[in-house]
A protein has these predicted regions:
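N- or domain-start disorder-to-order transition segments that initiate the globular core
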Residues: 11, 15-50
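Basic- and aromatic-enriched surface patches that contact anionic nucleotides/nucleic acids
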Residues: 4-22, 29, 56-62, 69-181
Length: 181
């Protein structure tokens, strides 16, 4: 485990971090996308992973077929994909997680497994259920690199801003829209 020290406004934010892997099938377990309902949440790992914490932006890859196909094809080809970051906290004595980075990837993967997305392979549109069993198993057993970040909510939000800063994709307004003042 490493101790990360984030310097923000002359304050030090302490977090404990460690790395590991998670199989896609373990992340997908109990996946629920209620983003179109009043509940509005997206969870997996039997409600232990909040894929869209309040500070995350909305899913922006909905119409980006090439990006989604490339992601799933990378997994099928066993190419590495970018790591994801889980914020770790305790809720009612149970260790739970919220996704700090990797929302677009995890939603795309879970929606594909759920049958809501298909991919183009050799010109054919295929849903997960239509794939050969060995490819389905390879996808489900694919291991995603995870960095776990344990700290209070303020530290997790600061960490989220820090790891998303180099991408310059998340605008300050997008961040302000997601986090109440």
């Amino acid at each position: 485990m490493a101790h990360a020290r984030l310097f923000t406004d002359t304050r030090v934010i302490n977090m404990i971090t460690w790395s590991g892997t998670k199989k896609i099938k373990d992340i997908f377990e109990g996946y629920k996308n209620n983003s179109d309902t009043e509940e509005g949440g997206i969870t997996s790992m039997n409600d232990k992973l909040n894929i869209r914490p309040r500070y995350q932006r909305l899913y922006i890859r909905e119409n980006d077929k090439v990006w989604k196909d490339n992601l799933i094809n990378s997994i099928i080809c066993k190419f590495p994909i970018n790591r994801v970051y889980f914020g770790v906290f305790e809720e009612n004595g149970v260790e739970s997680y919220e996704l700090l980075d990797g929302q677009q990837r995890l939603i795309t993967i879970c929606e594909f497994l759920n049958g809501k997305e298909s991919i183009t392979i050799n010109g054919d549109e295929l849903a997960f259920a239509a794939l050969p069993d060995d490819i389905k198993e390879d996808i489900l057993n694919y291991e995603i690199d995870v960095t776990y970040c344990k700290g209070d909510e303020d530290a997790r939000i600061k960490w989220f801003k820090r790891i998303n800063q180099p991408n310059s994709i998340l605008t300050e307004q997008e961040f302000l829209d997601r986090v109440p003042a």
